[in-house]
């Protein structure tokens, strides 16, 4: 158990030491009438490299074939396209206070069925090196389904099952440790009692012999 705890603590320290940007996939199921966050995270390969980044989001509604641009975010300015499906519903939720964007996520408020479809987060990054500049581009694709009621995904179900299994295993281990300790303490107590009894009998026997010797001498 001590080894397991050490490994867990070590992993946490390593994770903390690395820190920085971590690319995470977006959820793909939004609930009708609720606010939904579409994740778009694009990390630099080298965090120490200076960069400037901007993004454009495009959308293809379910049942259609063409992508249309819905927004552009550059130099901390959000430019929304005229689209009644997203009018007053899109909120920037990515990096702020920097031109070096790595989190380019957005919120869609009051989700409707018209928001079902495919989203593309286009990331355009200009990297600055000592003697030159380099342009890169990445496209993050997200397929979104809008449902009436939230469904639990398989990952959360498995996580909950594993949590209960871990609780049961730890409980059994704790009970076994308590039984083992109880037996060990009981055995030690019994051995000490037997040792005390033996010492008492030896002292009693010696006292009787001394008394007998005194009577004979008289």
Curated annotation (Swiss-Prot):
Main location: membrane
Keyword RNA-binding: no
GO cellular component: intercalated disc; node of Ranvier; perikaryon; plasma membrane; sodium channel complex; T-tubule; voltage-gated sodium channel complex
Topological domain ranges for the Extracellular compartment: 19-157
SUPFAM superfamilies: Immunoglobulin (SSF48726)
Molecular function per GO: sodium channel inhibitor activity; sodium channel regulator activity
Location relative to the cell: Cell membrane; Perikaryon; Cell projection; Cell projection, Axon
Similarity comment: family membership: Belongs to the sodium channel auxiliary subunit SCN1B (TC 8.A.17) family.
Subunit structure, as described in the record: A voltage-gated sodium (Nav) channel consists of an ion-conducting pore-forming alpha subunit functional on its own that is regulated by one or more beta subunits. Interacts with SCN1A; regulatory subunit of SCN1A/Nav1.1. Interacts with SCN3A; regulatory subunit of SCN3A/Nav1.3. Interacts with SCN4A; regulatory subunit of SCN4A/Nav1.4. Interacts with SCN5A; regulatory subunit of SCN5A/Nav1.5. Interacts with SCN8A; regulatory subunit of SCN8A/Nav1.6. Interacts with SCN9A; regulatory subunit of SCN9A/Nav1.7. Interacts with SCN10A; regulatory subunit of SCN10A/Nav1.8. Interacts with NFASC.
Protein name: Sodium channel regulatory subunit beta-1
Tissue expression from the record: Detected in hippocampus CA3 bipolar neurons (at protein level). Detected in skeletal muscle.
Disulphides: 21-43, 40-121
Gene3D superfamilies hit by this protein: Immunoglobulins
Function: Regulatory subunit of multiple voltage-gated sodium (Nav) channels directly mediating the depolarization of excitable membranes. Navs, also called VGSCs (voltage-gated sodium channels) or VDSCs (voltage-dependent sodium channels), operate by switching between closed and open conformations depending on the voltage difference across the membrane. In the open conformation they allow Na(+) ions to selectively pass through the pore, along their electrochemical gradient.
